[in-house]
Every structure is written in C-alpha cells, then in structure tokens.
C-alpha cells in the first residue's frame, strides 16, 4: 500500500510539475518572465530532474540579465547530459562574461555531440574572431560552409578576415560567392569596394560605392566618406558634392566632411568659401592635419603669407 501511495505521489508530482510548466509558458508568452520563473521553480520543486524546466529557466534568467545564475542552470544540465543546444547556449553565456576559453570548450563539446550543428559552428566562429584566433576562424568557416554552403554570414566573416590578413584575391572570391547567392548584399558589396580600393582598382571600387549609395540607399558614413574621396580622385565634383551634403545631414559634426566641402570649393577656385569650411573642420578637430595644410595652402593663394606660415607650422607640429 505504501509503495502504491508513493507511486501515486510521484505520478501526481509529475503531472503537477507539467501543469506548472504550462502555466510558466503562458506567462512567458505574455512577456511576464518573473511570473514565468516562479512557476518554473514550482515545477522544479516537485521534479528537480525536470531538464526542460531547467533549460527554460536558464533561458529566462539569461533574458533577465542574470547570466551567472543562468550558467549555473546550464552547468547542472550539461553535467549529466549530451544536449548540444545546452552546451551552445552555455558557450554564449561564457562569451558574454568574456570567458572565451570556456566558451570555445562548450562549442567544441556541442559539436562533438552533433558535428553538423551549424549554429554552434557560427557561434564558435564569432568567438574565435573575438579571441584573435584567426587561422582557426578560417578553418571553422570552411567547415561551416561545407555543411551550409548557402550560409552568407560565414562567407562574409571569412572574406573580412582574409581582407584584414591581406589575402585580397581569396577575400574577393568569398565576396563574389556571396553576390552569386544574393546580388544586392550590402555587406558583400561594401567589402568588395574596400578590397578593390586597397588593390588599386579605384574606378571599380567607386562603382560599388555608388551602387551602395545611389541604388541601395545605404547611408553608412564610412561608405559616404570613401565615395567622396574617390569622386575627388576621378574629378567627379558633382558626385562629391552630392555625397558631402548627404553626409553632413547625417553627421554635421564630422570634421572630415567639412574638410571635403572645403576641398570641393578649393577645386572650384572659390578660396574664401574653401577657407570657411576648412576652419569649420579645424574647429571640430583642432589637430586635423589635412585641414590645417589645406587652410595654409589657401591662405598662401590668397596672399596671406604670415597666416599661411603659421598654419603650416601648426600642421607640422602634429
């Protein structure tokens, strides 16, 4: 009789813990994570080995910002489980705390359980980048691409790393693969423009910057700056003016853009106007060497020699 009652109690506890789990999910669905956590704890009081409840608790704690307690839950789960998702999530939490070695160990364990777990591969790639382990990152990208050949972020990360390492032709091959998969991928087009500019193919680089701005409506300030610089290089002053004004609407406090505006007027021999904008650039950034040199040059053209010499000296002191 006692054994029967014990079994009935165990069954009752399991059913009640499931009820609490459902209740927890209902509150979670409404966005009430604290109440959801309360019912998860109730479920775990009745059934301490209820791994799914522990997993949901770990996720809720992480969302609420209690990373350490979330880690405790996941460590408890992974201590006697081969759940690749739990290891991947645990790795993410270690990464948030800056513990990259532990994070990488968790990703390895996750991939040891399921070697084609693309999410774990991607998280590992990101962690390797933050850890400065670039050769391993490239190898990991290749493995990820072998399992998920259409996964664009892997190509983008690989291309960017190859670019940083000076392996430009390989980087271009990765970028071109992305553009085969997604013709107007802005990250890939931006990387292609950067690489083309770096290897001296400036006219082609400008075409890609123009595509980003004029066709794809990209308003990244770095893209605009590069487009302005190359527009000047090829004496496309109308384009340069258009991009300068676009940039200043976004960042009126950007000294480089005011310098470019001064340069535009100097190229048109409007020296007083050029001087005004060079002064604006220097006001925003007193040590802007290019603006100081440009101002000195314009003052010299205007016959204001003493001021010009003073400005040259300021520039040379930097």
Curated annotation (Swiss-Prot):
Keywords: Repeat, TPR repeat. It comes from the Archaea. SMART domains: TPR (SM00028). It holds the Pfam family TPR_1. TPR repeats lie at residues 17-50, 84-117, 119-151, 152-185, 186-219, 221-254, 255-288, 289-318. The keyword Transport does not apply. InterPro entries: TPR-like_helical_dom_sf, TPR_rpt. The keyword Aminoacyl-tRNA synthetase does not apply. PANTHER family: CELL DIVISION CYCLE 16,23,27 (PTHR12558), CELL DIVISION CYCLE PROTEIN 27 HOMOLOG (PTHR12558:SF13). This is TPR repeat-containing protein MJ0940. It comes from Methanocaldococcus jannaschii (strain ATCC 43067 / DSM 2661 / JAL-1 / JCM 10045 / NBRC 100440) (Methanococcus jannaschii).
């Amino acid at each position: 009789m006692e054994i029967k009652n014990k079994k009935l109690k165990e069954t009752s506890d399991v059913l009640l813990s499931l009820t609490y789990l459902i209740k927890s999910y209902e509150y979670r669905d409404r966005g009430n994570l604290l109440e959801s956590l309360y019912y998860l704890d109730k479920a775990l009081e009745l059934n301490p080995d209820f791994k799914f409840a522990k997993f949901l608790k770990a996720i809720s704690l992480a969302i609420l910002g209690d990373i350490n307690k979330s880690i405790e839950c996941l460590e408890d789960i992974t201590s006697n489980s081969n759940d690749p998702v739990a290891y991947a999530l645990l790795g993410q939490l270690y990464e948030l705390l800056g513990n990259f070695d532990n994070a990488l160990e968790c990703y390895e364990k996750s991939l040891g359980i399921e070697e084609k777990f693309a999410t774990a591969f991607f998280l590992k790639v990101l962690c390797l980048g933050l850890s400065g382990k670039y050769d391993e990152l490239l190898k990991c990208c290749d493995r990820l691409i072998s399992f998920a050949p259409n996964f664009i972020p892997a190509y983008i990360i690989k291309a960017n790393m190859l670019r940083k390492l000076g392996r430009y032709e390989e980087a271009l091959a990765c970028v071109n693969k992305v553009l085969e998969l997604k013709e107007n991928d802005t990250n890939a087009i931006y990387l292609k423009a950067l690489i083309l500019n770096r290897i001296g193919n400036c006219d082609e680089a400008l075409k890609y910057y123009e595509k980003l701005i004029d066709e794809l409506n990209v308003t990244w300030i770095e893209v605009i700056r590069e487009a302005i610089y190359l527009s000047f290089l090829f004496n496309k002053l109308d384009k340069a003016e258009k991009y300068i004004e676009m940039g200043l609407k976004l960042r009126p406090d950007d000294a480089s853009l005011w310098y470019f505006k001064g340069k535009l007027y100097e190229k048109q021999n409007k020296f007083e106007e050029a001087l005004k904008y060079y002064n604006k650039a220097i006001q925003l950034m007193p040590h802007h060497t290019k603006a100081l040199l440009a101002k000195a040059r314009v003052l010299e053209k205007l016959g204001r020699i003493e001021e010009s010499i003073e400005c040259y000296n300021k520039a040379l002191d930097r």
